[in-house]
Each structure stands twice: as structure tokens, then as C-alpha cells.
Swiss-Prot record:
This protein's UniProt keywords: Chlorophyll biosynthesis, Cytoplasm, Isomerase, Porphyrin biosynthesis, Pyridoxal phosphate
Cofactor(s) needed for function: pyridoxal 5'-phosphate
The keyword Cytoplasm is assigned to this record: yes
Location within or outside the cell: Cytoplasm
Keyword Isomerase (UniProt): yes
EC numbers on record: 5.4.3.8
Gene designation: hemL
Designated name of the protein: Glutamate-1-semialdehyde 2,1-aminomutase
GO cellular component annotations of the record: cytoplasm
Gene3D superfamilies: Aspartate Aminotransferase, domain 1 (3.90.1150.10), Type I PLP-dependent aspartate aminotransferase-like (Major domain) (3.40.640.10)
Residues annotated with N6-(pyridoxal phosphate)lysine modification: 276
Catalyzed reactions: (S)-4-amino-5-oxopentanoate = 5-aminolevulinate
Disulfide bonds: none
One GO term (biological process): chlorophyll biosynthetic process
Length: 436
């Protein structure tokens, strides 16, 4: 790969044609809003194939990819061991609709790794996992109200589309048309990292809050880590008021550490949602937690939840192989080293080129904002210079670096990214930032 790809040679003719056709076939031309490049301008590039740390579009342009299918590709795209395992699984069938041994094998790995999980249920997406865990919180406690945090995204279910992040933040929507007031009337919101606001909600509703759900490290409003004591404070508050604490680790699970945020920070929730990495690039989700809570889920208990393709052999196979790769010695040390080099390099170059920028990283996950910061919550994230981010994104794209097309999304590194990839990325960033 050449060190940079300049705009004079950046041809996206075929991508434009494909996207133009897509807009007559699908709403906005995409299957998920952020892919349409609405917040950064211009037409999206249309991918043709991916391998390792790289993606190629239909015009033949090559990119260093820092989205990684929005998180699942932590071992790199199309990892040979994952592809071979899937090839063998395909020969046995794509979906059984019946129990299979692969479910046991992935469940055992999840339970072994994630401190809060004593039992697990597989579903087909992170949204589905969060929908089910919300129902379970209410079923177990007999209470209805739930606290979520502004800018935290837990999927597109009605009850979570209140001050949500991810695509909702990208489009600047406070919620979504079509969501009845009744669906969100029991959803309480607080600023992320604001323990006093959560205390106030519990004081106002001491006996009616089923639990608190959050991204323990926010990735759907940009990268925002928890302040010291915040997660611990939530654990104490929920225990004090008899409520449940739920970590949405769809993004962070098996990424920032093998056991997720809860293992790295030492704060153990009652329930956890998972997705992305545990499917190795195939559609998957899961929720799990304490045995006494999970035994409420049908058919063991009265709380109903089901899915035609849940636990399908292909997703289970890809997940098993991906987790086995991640368990190898040195994995997360490498992810931390490569992510640190990228994230600290971007901040240094921004300073040297005269731009206000703040940001941070954890192994395999990073983010930055065009503001002096600090950014501790969604409101502070919105102070970022979105026009500058859009110009930066375009400049990087033209130079062969694919970043998330939204200021309000985290970036991801993988085991396939090399120091040379990071150096090329930083060289491109210096070139772009010098012109903004």
C-alpha cells in the first residue's frame, strides 16, 4: 500500500453509481443510517472486500480500516482461522433451529471470561440483547423505571431512544418519530459520569427503579471513559436501592480486555449484554448474569424471549474461533500498544498543527474530539467542531484511511493493524491537519 492516496487520484465513480442506485432501493441508500455519511458530507464509499486491517472499495481504492465492521473484527477482517472454521461449519448446515453443541462451547467461554456472567442466552443482535435484558430487569425486580445515560446507545428499541447516541446523535435527533410516550415514560436519563444526578433520581424514585443500564465506556457518543469512582458509585447506589446494574458491553466486551470493562475496572454488574466480537463478524448478541436472575428466562422461568436464528451454528463457530485467538498470550498487550501509538500520535500532531483536540484510548478502542475538552459526557461531546471533523474525515478518506463517518462514534484497532499502518495513518493526519 502506498503511504498516502491523494485526492487527485481518488476516484469513486463506481461507488457513486452504486450508492445512487441504492437510494432508490433502500431508505437513504443504506441498511444503517451512519453509513450514509450524512454527518461528514459527500457520498459513502461502497466496500467490495476486506482482509486483515484493510478494506477495498468497488473502485479499487484501498483503506486502512479503523471501523472493523463497527467493532467485531478485532482479530482482523477475514481471519484465515475464522474463515476455515466457518467453511467446515457450512458443510453441516447454516441453521438448525435446535440445540447444538457449539452453543455450549461459546457459552462456556463467555462464562469463564466475563465476571458477572453465570448463565448466558444468545440472541441475534445487541439491540435484541438490550431489549431482553430490560424486560428481565423489570421481571426480576417487579419495578418499571430504568435509568439510562444521555448519549449511551442500547439499540433502536423504542424504550431506549431517549437522548440516545450512535446514529441518533449523528442525525441530531433527540429521539425518533413513531416512539409513543408510553414506551419511554419509564425511562429516566442522567448525564454520563454524573453520579449526583443518579443519586437524585434514586431519591425521587426510591422504590420504583428496576435498574441502571449504561455503556461502561461510552463508544456511541464518541469515546468517553468513566471518571474515577463513577462505576463504583453506580454499583453502590444500585445495591443500596435494591436495583440492578447492567453493563452494555456489546462494544467493549472482549475488546478492551478479554473479560471486558468489568474485568479491567473491577466493577461487577448484575447483568451484561454482549455482541460484536462474540460473533466474529456474524450477527449475534447475548445477555447474561447472575444465575438467580437468568433462571427467570423461559423456559427455565416465566420471562419470555425467543429467536429463530439464536445460537445458530455459524455465529457460534465464528465466535468460538475469535475468542480462542484472543486468548493467546500477548493479545491485549499488543492492542494496547498499537492503540496508544495511534491515539497519542493524533493528539500530538493536532497540537503541533495548532488544532484543539482531546481524546483517549483503551486497548483496541480510541476516540478524539475537535475541542480542548475535557469530554466527560454527551453535552461536552457536542462542543466538538463538527465541520472540522467532517473536513478531517474527508481528507483522511482521500489518503486511504477509513475512520468512522461520525464524530459520535469510537474507532477500533485490531490485531491485524501494524505499526507501519499507524505510521501511515499519522502521516496522513499530519498532512490533513496542516491544511485545515
Amino acid at each position: 500500500m502506498t503511504s498516502t492516496l491523494h485526492s487527485t487520484s481518488f476516484n469513486t465513480t463506481r461507488s457513486k453509481q452504486v450508492f445512487a442506485r441504492a437510494q432508490s432501493l433502500m431508505p437513504g441508500g443504506v441498511s444503517s443510517p451512519v453509513r450514509a455519511f450524512k454527518s461528514v458530507g459527500g457520498d459513502p464509499v461502497v466496500f467490495d472486500r476486506v482482509s486483515g486491517a484493510y478494506a477495498w472499495d468497488v473502485d479499487g481504492n484501498q483503506y486502512i480500516d479503523y471501523i472493523g465492521s463497527w467493532g467485531p473484527a478485532i482479530v482482523g477482517h477475514a481471519h484465515p482461522e475464522v474463515i476455515e472454521a466457518l467453511r467446515r461449519a457450512l458443510e453441516k448446515g447454516t441453521s438448525f433451529g435446535a440445540p447444538c453443541v457449539l452453543e455450549n462451547e461459546l457459552a462456556e467461554r463467555v462464562i469463564e471470561a466475563v465476571p458477572s456472567v453465570e448463565m448466558v442466552r444468545f440472541v441475534n443482535s445487541g439491540t435484541e440483547a438490550c431489549m431482553a435484558v430490560l424486560r428481565l430487569m423489570r421481571a426480576y425486580t417487579g419495578r418499571e423505571k430504568v435509568i439510562k445515560f444521555e448519549g449511551c446507545y442500547h439499540g433502536h428499541a423504542d424504550m431506549f431512544l431517549v437522548k440516545a447516541g450512535s446514529g441518533v446523535a449523528t442525525l441530531g435527533l433527540p429521539d425518533s418519530p413513531g416512539v409513543p410516550k408510553a414506551a419511554t415514560s419509564a425511562t429516566l436519563t442522567a448525564p454520563y459520569n454524573d453520579l449526583e444526578a443518579v443519586k437524585a433520581l434514586f431519591e425521587q424514585h426510591p422504590d420504583s427503579i428496576a435498574g441502571v443500564i449504561l455503556e461502561p465506556v461510552v463508544g456511541n457518543a464518541g469515546f468517553i471513559p468513566p471518571q474515577p469512582g463513577f462505576l463504583e458509585g453506580l454499583r453502590d447506589l444500585t445495591q443500596k436501592y435494591g436495583a440492578l446494574l447492567v453493563f452494555d458491553e456489546v462494544m467493549t466486551g472482549f475488546r478492551i480486555s478479554y473479560g471486558g470493562v468489568q474485568a479491567k475496572f473491577g466493577v461487577i454488574p448484575d447483568l451484561t449484554t454482549l455482541g460484536k466480537v462474540i460473533g466474529g463478524g456474524l450477527p449475534v448478541g447475548a445477555y447474561g448474569g447472575r444465575r438467580e436472575i437468568m433462571e427467570m428466562v423461559a423456559p427455565a422461568g416465566p420471562m419470555y424471549q425467543a429467536g429463530t436464528l439464536s445460537g445458530n451454528p455459524l455465529a457460534m463457530t465464528a465466535g468460538i474461533q475469535t475468542l480462542d485467538i484472543l486468548r493467546r498470550p500477548g493479545t491485549y498487550e499488543y492492542l494496547e500498544r498499537i492503540t496508544e501509538k495511534l491515539a497519542t500520535g493524533l493528539l500530538q500532531i493536532a497540537r503541533e498543527t495548532g488544532h484543539e483536540m482531546c481524546g483517549g484510548y483503551l486497548p483496541g478502542m480510541f476516540g478524539f474530539f475537535f475541542t480542548a475538552g475535557p469530554v466527560r459526557n454527551y453535552e461536552e461531546a457536542k462542543t466538538s467542531d463538527l465541520q472540522k471533523f467532517a473536513r478531517f474525515h474527508r481528507g483522511m478518506l482521500e489518503r486511504g484511511v477509513y475512520l468512522a463517518p461520525s464524530q459520535f462514534e469510537a474507532g477500533f484497532t485490531s490485531l491485524a493493524h501494524t505499526e507501519a499502518d499507524v505510521e501511515k495513518t499519522l502521516a496522513a493526519a499530519r498532512e490533513v491537519l496542516s491544511t485545515l
